[in-house]
């Protein structure tokens, strides 16, 4: 059993009581809601005559269903418009702050909360979205929850949860040029598997994570769920504090000093006990690309698609399914795989630092003929900042489309979708069958820089060669 970890300290600080079931009734400090998983939850409240208990601890935005080309209302998709109107009404009726389109604050829920300073160390955070683990980058314990749990948090500001075990994942060393946080997390998921973290919270530690910016740390924690972990976190440090200071909802004055003192106290103790510890070396990580239908089916860009005999027996059935669906051959190099669509964005890689890095490689080049490439900022604030820096012009001159903020092609809930059996090079987080809108569409996950390299060459390419 873990002891003295940040997870234990934050969990204990938010424990209301131990329930007869053995679960913990856990107080939730921040509840983030969006248009997809909240309408039914609000409907259940109305059926019971209940109101939102703590509207000041609840923040709403719209992200999943919003079009990124034409955002004029009403939306062309009547179901999307219906969800939008429902969220607007539910937020207004319950006194919830709503970051609506055009407010300057709208965007993907896991992008706007950190950039506004809503996400802070030591918090418990819940959202009806799988990638809520993103907020763990700040030293928060953040869970994705289902619609019935969204209802519970709205009504009681608590959740009934079983306490998780804690696994420390340590990565040490300096990442080579062309290797990014996205490659680190894809490498970890490849090694530990998509179910390896079931029942665990992951603590990411070591010199590699310590050297990362907050936005890079968010990329890592965002995909903790893809490795089976319920949440993932990084201990807060000066990088965290520097990022938060001065943001809209960050403490100020004496309250800031008190907050930092507490944030430092919740760091995992030097002698903390973990349920498991796994260590990786940064030098073993290269630009990584997924070849299959789970985020765990990834390989270095210099490798070949694994042959069945090289895989553990337990992985062979899903590998066979992946070969057939992806129309890729075992033993073939992943490098050179043709791509049709290139997407940069999502709650994994749609922040300003992601766009800066992508623009660096796009500048002076052009998207290959026949390839559709587009960039979707993670929030309105990211879009404004990118345009102030001229990044939009770099992308457009290179042949990329420049869009409005939203989830876009990460998932098939808005107009940005693959067609037929197109292959996409995507900076998003999931490569499941049909994830990007076509039942036969295929997704290759990679870093934004690698997406640019693929767009320029029309095929999976090694971004390190683009540098040279």
From Swiss-Prot:
Co-factor: note: Binds 1 [4Fe-4S] cluster per subunit.
Bridged cysteine pairs (disulfide): none
Binding-site residues, [4Fe-4S] cluster: 347, 407, 410
Organism expressing this protein natively: Rippkaea orientalis (strain PCC 8801 / RF-1) (Cyanothece sp. (strain PCC 8801))
The protein, known as: 3-isopropylmalate dehydratase large subunit
InterPro entries in alphabetical order: 3-IsopropMal_deHydase_lsu, Acnase/IPM_dHydase_lsu_aba_1/3, Acoase/IPM_deHydtase_lsu_aba, Aconitase_4Fe-4S_BS, Aconitase_4Fe-4S_dom, IPM_dehydratase_rel_enz, IPMI_cat
Entry's family note: Belongs to the aconitase/IPM isomerase family. LeuC type 1 subfamily.
Keywords assigned by UniProt, alphabetized: 4Fe-4S, Amino-acid biosynthesis, Branched-chain amino acid biosynthesis, Iron, Iron-sulfur, Leucine biosynthesis, Lyase, Metal-binding
Pathway entry: Amino-acid biosynthesis; L-leucine biosynthesis; L-leucine from 3-methyl-2-oxobutanoate: step 2/4
